């Protein structure tokens, strides 16, 4: 004999009403639609496809960090230039530059591994910038103050012009990647040849000029990528890439101006 089933009173608050329709999806997703900027920061949407407010906030952050990096580098450069004893000690102890190079690689590796880990990403970025400032501060002591200032202003002008051109251009500069990659390795490996084959002033000038063109290309390439390939969360790595482009371009322009000055003196 089947059991007698008794219907549950619908007004009993202790029993859920399973027949009731579930709430609309928008009720669960309400918090996500209240602030669309939050969703865009959580996914991998490229900066160029984000809302204008997010794009502008990202660019302000990137170039503010870049400005701070250049300030720290200039500070170290000024200390070394105004106090030659520091640079003289480094020149007399080349092991320091070698150690500085390997520490820079370790710090850079840590930054690449933890680009979103606050505050470690800022600490790694500051340490890397300081170490680069030590190396650059030693290098610029071989040049006159006039040449250094000329190189700074030329580099700044070229950097701003190329950045502005990339922002308004419709060209896809990511296509330069293959050429720039091969060119960069050429810049790294070619000096090894000079250990066996003596260089000439013409070769040195051509090599510095080629390096200038390569890092001008990298400014176009990296500026395009931070807009079209990077998400708004990747501001630390964006600043780092632009910083390395600026410093490497400055070094090549400084070399060219120094060689031109030597030719005039001769």
From Swiss-Prot:
GO terms for molecular function: calcium channel activity. GO terms for cellular component: endoplasmic reticulum membrane; fungal-type vacuole membrane; Golgi membrane; membrane; mitochondrial membrane. The keyword Membrane applies. It is found in: Endoplasmic reticulum membrane; Mitochondrion membrane; Golgi apparatus membrane; Vacuole membrane. GO terms for biological process: calcium-mediated signaling; endoplasmic reticulum unfolded protein response. It is a multi-pass membrane protein. The keyword Transmembrane applies. Keywords: Apoptosis, Endoplasmic reticulum, Golgi apparatus, Membrane, Mitochondrion, Transmembrane, Transmembrane helix, Vacuole. It comes from the Eukaryota. The chain crosses the membrane at residues 70-90, 92-112, 123-143, 147-167, 177-197, 201-221, 240-260. Residues 1-22 are annotated as: Disordered. Its main location: endoplasmic reticulum. Links the unfolded protein response and programmed cell death and mediates mitochondrial-dependent apoptosis. Induces cell death and disruption of the mitochondrial transmembrane potential. PANTHER family: BAX INHIBITOR-RELATED (PTHR23291), PROTEIN LIFEGUARD 4 (PTHR23291:SF50). Belongs to the BI1 family. LFG subfamily. This is Bax inhibitor 1. It comes from Schizosaccharomyces pombe (strain 972 / ATCC 24843). The lineage of its organism: Eukaryota, Fungi, Dikarya, Ascomycota, Taphrinomycotina. The gene is bxi1.
């Amino acid at each position: 004999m089947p059991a007698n089933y008794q219907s549950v009173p619908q007004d009993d608050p202790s029993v859920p009403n399973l027949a009731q329709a579930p709430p609309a999806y928008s009720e669960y997703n309400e918090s996500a639609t209240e602030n669309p900027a939050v969703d865009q920061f959580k996914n991998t949407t490229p900066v160029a496809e984000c809302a204008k407010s997010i794009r502008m906030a990202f660019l302000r952050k990137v170039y503010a960090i870049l400005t701070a990096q250049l300030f720290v580098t200039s500070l170290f450069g000024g200390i070394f230039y105004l106090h030659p004893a520091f640079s003289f000690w480094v020149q007399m102890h080349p092991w320091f530059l070698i150690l500085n190079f390997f520490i820079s690689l370790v710090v850079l590796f840590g930054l690449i591994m933890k680009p979103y880990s606050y505050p470690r990403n800022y600490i790694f970025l500051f340490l890397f910038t300081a170490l680069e400032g030590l190396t650059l501060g030693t290098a610029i002591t071989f040049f006159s103050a006039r040449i250094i200032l000329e190189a700074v202003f030329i580099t700044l002008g070229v950097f701003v012009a190329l950045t502005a051109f990339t922002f308004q251009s419709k060209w896809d500069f990511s296509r330069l990647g293959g050429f720039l990659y091969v060119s960069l390795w050429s810049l790294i490996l070619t000096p090894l040849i000079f250990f066996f084959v003596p260089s000439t002033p013409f070769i040195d000038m051509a090599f510095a000029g080629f390096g200038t063109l390569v890092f001008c290309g990298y400014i176009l390439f990296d500026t395009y990528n931070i807009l079209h390939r990077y998400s708004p969360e990747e501001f630390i790595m964006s600043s780092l890439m632009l910083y390395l482009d600026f410093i490497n371009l400055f070094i090549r322009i400084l070399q060219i101006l120094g060689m031109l000055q030597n030719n005039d003196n001769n």
